[in-house]
Every structure is written in C-alpha cells, then in structure tokens.
C-alpha cells in the first residue's frame, strides 16, 4: 500500500499506537510499494519490510533507580523484654513462633501483674468512673 501525502505531515506512533511528538532533527526516508519495497530511517531506528515503514526504536524498558519493594511474611523481629523495653528476637524464636502448638521454652512477660481488660482501660480514661 503506497503512502499518500507529504511525509513530514504524518503523525508518528509508538508500538502501542500512541502519538509521539517529534523533537530535534531527523533524517531518513521510507520507500515502498505493493511488492518488495524496503524502508529505512527514522529518529531512532528503522525497519525494513514490504511496505517501508519508519521505526521509532525498540520496545525495551529499563527502570533504573527504582527498587522493588520486597516483603517477607516473617513475624516481628523484636518483643517485650518484660522491663518496659524491647529486645531483638533470635532465629530460633521466630521459627518457634510460626510453629503451631505449645512452646515450652518461650520467653514472655514474667511480671505478676494482672492484665487489664478492654472495659477496665476505658473506665480508667473516663473521669469519675473509678
């Protein structure tokens, strides 16, 4: 199929059919016909074929400077040390935490205080409810 009109007025498109704005100076011509024509040229590169098309480069994408966020499904890396602070868990503790069932040598809070329930915490915040 022959191309009609002035080639300078033709719109360029990328590999997805989106219009591409031309910037800068470019050289190259496309020639072709119904059979056996070749095409060369373009801003970044050309393709040759039956009808002579002008190419706009390759479709490879490199995202430099962007890092992919990776998350593991591991548990928390620290726990309460029983003295109001936090301490780092070891590998054994993380593995034991994931395993089902009772854990005999578990670390935990060793204070003798009674834990407050949700209602007790709310009542403590409301003035005059003591």
UniProtKB/Swiss-Prot annotation:
Keyword terms: Stress response
Compositionally biased intervals (Basic and acidic residues): 61-73, 92-130
Swiss-Prot/TrEMBL GO biological process terms: cold acclimation; response to abscisic acid; response to water deprivation
Region annotated Disordered, chain positions: 1-130
Segment forming the signal sequence: none
Entry's induction text: By abscisic acid (ABA) and salt stress.
Stretches with biased composition (Gly residues): 27-58
Pfam families per the UniProt record, alphabetical: Dehydrin (PF00257)
Bilayer-crossing regions: none
InterPro entries with a match to the protein in the record: Dehydrin, Dehydrin_CS
Presence of keyword tRNA-binding: no
Family, similarity comment: Belongs to the plant dehydrin family.
Protein name as annotated: Abscisic acid and environmental stress-inducible protein TAS14
Name of the gene this protein is made from: TAS14
